[in-house]
Amino acid sequence: MRIEKCYFCSGPIYPGHGMMFVRNDCKVFRFCKSKCHKNFKKKRNPRKVRWTKAFRKAAGKELTVDNSFEFEKRRNEPVKYQRELWNKTIDAMKRVEEIKQKRQAKFIMNRLKKNKELQKVQDIKEVKQNIHLIRAPLAGKGKQLEEKMVQQLQEDVDMEEAS
């Protein structure tokens, strides 16, 4: 089963799905959905359309340079079937996918770290600017305690006068 790539969004196209457009010069364009086909007909650049993989890679939002991508390249060299080789290949594919997932997660976390640091700096700046809006948690407690003590003293004095 051959899984093709969409020309516009680089998404996977499974057999029996999508649409194929063949130009007069025999160049084949495959599209996964009508949305991609319409955008292609409107001559939109996939690197400028924000939801495409091309945009995400160009903007640095996804991992682009990594050795694990070398395994996905198409090889048109026929190989004689051997059960051992087949099993080793499947194990290697699982391992490569595992490594790729880890690297992508690490890349995303590193990308988000910068934003977290900027957010911290902005929060500190905002607190410094609006410090007058923040009340100290024990600011009103002193007055309340003082009022309670005055009230108790008053009650004690009243009790002594009554007796």
From Swiss-Prot:
Localization of this protein: Nucleus, Nucleolus
One GO term describing the cellular component: nucleoplasm
Protein name, as recorded: Probable ribosome biogenesis protein RLP24
Function as written in the Swiss-Prot or TrEMBL entry: Involved in the biogenesis of the 60S ribosomal subunit. Ensures the docking of GTPBP4/NOG1 to pre-60S particles.
Family: Belongs to the eukaryotic ribosomal protein eL24 family.
HAMAP family associated with the record: Ribosomal_eL24
Keyword Nucleus appears in the UniProt entry: yes
GO molecular function: structural constituent of ribosome
BP-aspect Gene Ontology terms: ribosome biogenesis
SMART domains: TRASH
CDD domains named in the record: Ribosomal_L24e_L24
Record-linked InterPro entries: L24e/L24_sf (IPR038630), Ribosomal_eL24 (IPR056366), Ribosomal_eL24-rel_arc (IPR055345), Ribosomal_eL24-rel_N (IPR000988), Ribosomal_eL24_CS (IPR023442), TRASH_dom (IPR011017)
Organism: Mus musculus
Presence of keyword Transit peptide: no
